[in-house]
């Protein structure tokens, strides 16, 4: 299921760095994580949906690049977002 505007607004409010923030790496990573989790649930039911699986892999790659960017730019912010989202177990 696609991410609703309401859910996206909630994520932005939770992870924004400053007022009117919608594009910071933290917000982008949080939104991608939510989409990845939704798509994972879809693929558990629809195992042969290879088109969606490719979209999932693209999203995971984009999130990985954003995490690498954030880690290089500010390690404290990187650790905080990883902790909040429960990534890197």
Swiss-Prot record:
Q: What is the purpose of this protein?
A: One of the primary rRNA binding proteins, it binds directly to 16S rRNA where it helps nucleate assembly of the platform of the 30S subunit by binding and bridging several RNA helices of the 16S rRNA.
Q: Name one GO biological process term.
A: translation
Report the sequence similarity comment from the record.
Answer: Belongs to the universal ribosomal protein uS15 family.
Q: Which Gene3D superfamilies match?
A: 6.10.250.3130, S15/NS1, RNA-binding
Q: Which organism is it from?
A: Geobacillus stearothermophilus
Q: Which NCBIfam families is this protein grouped with?
A: S15_bact
A molecular function (GO) held by this record is: rRNA binding
Q: Name one GO cellular component term.
A: cytosolic small ribosomal subunit
The record's keywords, sorted A to Z, are:
Ribonucleoprotein, Ribosomal protein, RNA-binding, rRNA-binding
Name under which the protein is recorded: Small ribosomal subunit protein uS15
Which Pfam families does the entry mention? Ribosomal_S15
The record's HAMAP family line, in alphabetical order, gives: Ribosomal_uS15_B
Where does the secretion signal sit in this chain? none
* Subunit structure comment from the entry: Part of the 30S ribosomal subunit. Forms a bridge to the 50S subunit in the 70S ribosome, contacting the 23S rRNA.
